[in-house]
Amino acid sequence: MLLEKNIEKRKSLLYYLMFVGIMFLLPEHVEANEFIVKDGKAGAEIIIAENPTRMQKLAAEELQFFIHKISGANLMISTSVTDENLVKIYVGKSSYTDALKHSTEGLKYDAYHMISGNDYLVLLGNDEDASMKGPGDNIYKRDSKSSEEATEKWDKLVGHSRWVLPGRSRYQSYSRELGVRYNDQRGSLMAVYDLLRSLGARWYFPGEFGEVLPQTKTIALPKVKKTIHPDFPMRQITGSAYKFGKSNKRQALWMMRLGLGGLPVSGVHGINNIIHRDETRNDHPERFLLTRGKRAFAGHGKPCLSSKGLLEDNIKYVRTLFDVYGKESASVMPTDGFVTCACDLCKGEFTPELGARGVQSNHVWTYVNNVAKEVYQTHPNHKIVCLAYGSYVVSPSNIDRMSPNVYVMLNNGRGGFVDPELRDLSISRRNEWLKKLTSKQPFTTHGNYTWLGNSPVPWYIPHTIAEDIRSLKGICIGEYIEENCLRPGELRDDQPAPVKLAINHLNIYVTARLWWDADQDIDVLLNDYYKKFYGPAEKEMKAFFEYCEANVRTMARSKEQIQKALDLFGLAEEKVDKSSIYGQRVGLISKSLDSSRNLLRQLSVDRSNVSRFKPFRFDNDKEIVIDGDLEDPYWKRTRFGQLKSTNVENHKPKIKTLLKKGMSTSSLYLALICETEEGKQTEKLNKKKDDPSIWEGEYVDILIETDTHAYYQISISPNGELVDLKVNGEKQDFRWDSLAEYAIKKSENQWVLEIKIPFLTNNGDPNHKLDGRYPKGDKAPWYINVGRKRTKEGKPLLCSVAHTGVDSFHVIEKFARCFMGKSSAERAAKATAKPIPE
């Protein structure tokens, strides 16, 4: 009997030791089930489905990752409950949420439940993987062969090769690093981020640079029961850096942490899909609009909406898109840069009485409505979408009620709403559209934040954004906003936080959070931002932001306001340690203010009587070949101007220097014919770099002051020698390389220089290319001087665009003002002469 008792005791001890050993192998946890984390130890585990979807898996990983960063505790992810004593966090749909009778029914567009019990927390939304119907389901692999195969299947399916494959850009939505697609449903992920925000987490900027996390060793199980639906089903910000397939992990995660997503966008310029293949161009040239006596084939072509067969083809295409790909909506919007057609069929279709923004409204919207009416008969629950854009912004005067399936994407210039008149005009147009549309939420808006980030002064407009988004709640299904300041390469892990987001990160953050809750107090949201993002500089940065917003309309023209803003910012800089995260964030804003500092310098120079430097607009860089041949069509469209003496006003030298100039949105182009004295030959070409002795002989000087830099100098001799440098006062920086592409062509008694000078907006590389914004309009112009120096009998002879009054090109207050398009005064005069009808 005693022996049996000893054996039982030994068994009990063995079982106890085995239990203790197993417990040592498991993550540290607490015994009570009231805490997710207690004293740095795990008090919960994360439960997901046996076969989780892509986004469900990511949601669990994000929760695990951030709980660890916040508390140091490691929560286990499992497909089943492993310890009844732990809090169960059910992330996404599983057999456990089914047993608790929590359903995803009705949770559309990333809506979610957050429900707690005595020992569990449900974070539940729709997490379905995006379905990829139709030919091209494997294009996301970015395999060119798969694209070719899909196109063959598509052509066979539709019986011809006129239509563009709908799924051709699917690769852009797939993140290889995360293993998710942009259109995957992500309701549970939104619930995870809501939970983390309730703990104090914020994501103001991509990566750890913009991450704000609390530090705590204890996280209680919240008592919560709520269902959250976004105020706007569609919450899209687009641009090359905002496509999962082109961007990187930190940018893709930032987008999701902001809450972007929801209802997919049907796209813009949908008519491209039925005219942008060679078969249409070859077999149906009449489907392209007529301009200047020729069919518009350039850039894949622009359609003639009156042409025979185009409407019928578009109707068939849209129905095929709905049937084969399961799309809910389709765009039938005309191509970008759509202009009036001069063919006989289009005569009388235009409405100049509706003003510049309505001259094509009746023409375009009749076409859209005709497509919609036919499609409505077979697909009444699908949407036909077109953007009110360009010359068809105004609602049509010949249609009282649009077909019920027409959804209008209104061109919403929110950045300009700091001007009450522009906002009133936009709302007036919106209300006119609402009279003609029948569905509950009949439109989306299309905006563009690019120019907010490209402004020479800080364009922070959180209150304007809040006011406009509130006005759209309930009548607008969502928004589609372009942001093209940022490029994918600037988001690589080895790159610093991009300066191009220094302004727009706040505009984007505010927009994204208001899309979920339009009625929240914007000042509470902003005060939270100032405190969490700038720490010890909270009050000073708040004063800076508020001053910038209050004076945003006039600051670009006021040196006093720019100086005041810079002074306020200087107070914030004094509050932070530059090496701290707060100092780095303030430092990023400081870099973005270089354009304001340069604008202040420009405004301080008297340039009231300078001449105009007006390049011809080049739309397509690809067609321009730098070879010294000025007989190309793009140069033939421009006129020569002759350079004049620098120190004798209006004197044209006998030995001429002729100049042509052009500009695209990314490069400045110059062409010069430099006459020489009869019988004089230049030396053999020798493309030598950065030898200052070039200035002792003959050369062409190109001096460019952008909106962000004092000025750049590029000097080129007839022998092909080049010197390029940055000039800032007395400082000369020869490290800078313009990366200019140039060619010199010599003939008897003249030499020709053709040059392409690239530029980048908010160029993060200080040693390459011009740093400057495309000077559209005169609010942030460039200042340029182009000159030529030659020598006769040992005496220098100078001629240039600007009359400097001395034997020098470098008199900055005389540089010619360069901007594209009309000046503010010219636009105001035109608007007064021809008011746009309300």
Summary of predicted features, one role per range:
Residues 58-61, 65, 69, 190-193, ...:
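Solvent-exposed, polar/charged alpha-helical surfaces in well-ordered, non-transmembrane soluble domains
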